[in-house]
Amino acid sequence: MRIGHGFDVHKFGGEGPIIIGGVRIPYEQGLLAHSDGDVALHAATDALLGAAALGDIGKLFPDTDPAFKGVDSRKLLREAYSRIREKGYRIGNLDITIIAQAPKMLPHIPQMRVNLAEDLQCHIDDINVKATTTEKLGFVGRKEGIACEAVALLVKE
């Protein structure tokens, strides 16, 4: 078994909607990023890559490469997981915490879990997504951006 941790943060800017966990969520602002700005999938991808000792999302998909401009983060997650499978690992479980004052994530979490389970070729019970606020503290509390943490467990096939 191998454990990895991932973290991502993106600042609000421009027009919405935002994409979190592969779900388009209506919001008055978007998230500034080279890709689609999906903090949940970026943190999850980093956690998985870390568990497999494959570096991080920036190493595999650098923001200096125009090929990744505006890219769907589900595509990046699937590519990273393909490399992990080549090393002989599969998902044990994935736990994601979205940290956002707004918008509310709860109505969108079921579809996020479906998307992740589909992309990681695993049972939905292997995927947990939850959301919290910072009680109006810090940049998240001031609604300046969204952060996300993820922990992944990989098991050898």
From Swiss-Prot:
GO terms for molecular function: 2-C-methyl-D-erythritol 2,4-cyclodiphosphate synthase activity; metal ion binding. Keywords: Isoprene biosynthesis, Lyase, Metal-binding. InterPro entries: MECDP_synthase, MECDP_synthase_CS, MECDP_synthase_sf. GO terms for biological process: isopentenyl diphosphate biosynthetic process, methylerythritol 4-phosphate pathway; terpenoid biosynthetic process. Binds 1 divalent metal cation per subunit. SUPFAM superfamilies: IpsF-like (SSF69765). A divalent metal cation binds at D8, H10, H42. Belongs to the IspF family. Homotrimer. This is 2-C-methyl-D-erythritol 2,4-cyclodiphosphate synthase. It comes from Photorhabdus laumondii subsp. laumondii (strain DSM 15139 / CIP 105565 / TT01) (Photorhabdus luminescens subsp. laumondii).
